[in-house]
Amino acid sequence: MTAGPATVEDGGAADASFAQRYYDLHPVYRLGLRWGFIIAATAGAFHQSLLSLIEVTRNGSLGGYVWTVLAAAILVAFAVARRRRTELPIHDRQTDIIVGLMAMGVGILIQWVLLPRYDLYFLLLRLDLVAMWLFVTSSAVLLFGLRPVIRFAWVWGMLLMVFPLPYYLAVLTFGGGKTSAGAATLLISGVGAGIAMGTTYRRGFVASVAAWVIGFALLAVITIFLHEAPLLVYQQVPALAALCVVGAAG
């Protein structure tokens, strides 16, 4: 007769012990565990999208620029994280859960409803990447809270550049070809530099211009001396190198 309550108490004690061990960890380890969980969940939920993106990149398609967006966003996030925190240490878990679940619901609707509806334009729109963005963002809200996510709002906004249609239009506007693809990705590095260094509007503008100047110089070198380089080199090297140089100089 006493087995039931004892079992419940044992289960509660086990949960409390697990929570205590988790919160006893160094904050860096807790941060790593949370991001590890988000990455694993995203890889499991969107493995087909990731495999498709890898295949597109291996085939030398324009869609490989998405990796440049991801790498640039990670670099910019590190720069933003180094700034002095200004938000109040207030956390409302109910709001976090509501906002996180709503965003995740929208992502699920895009993945399950809109994606099949616009299957003919899959490579042009890549709505699955938009759904993945919503999944990661909502997971971050649920695990970290809304205020910490808002602190990196510009970085999250930058990650929306994985929606490929504007990039494709920019490449066509610049004339098409590998050099045009590289020039279009410099828009990513310019935006990233402005966010990373933009403690003021003036600093952000100067950083963006500097990233574009350095990026176009590197792109010219690749076009002239390494003309046969793969498309991914045109898309990644000038943009990421310019972002790193501006970040180091700042």
Predicted regions and their residues:
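Hydrophobic N-terminal alpha-helices or hydrophobic patches in metabolic proteins across all domains
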Residues: 2-250
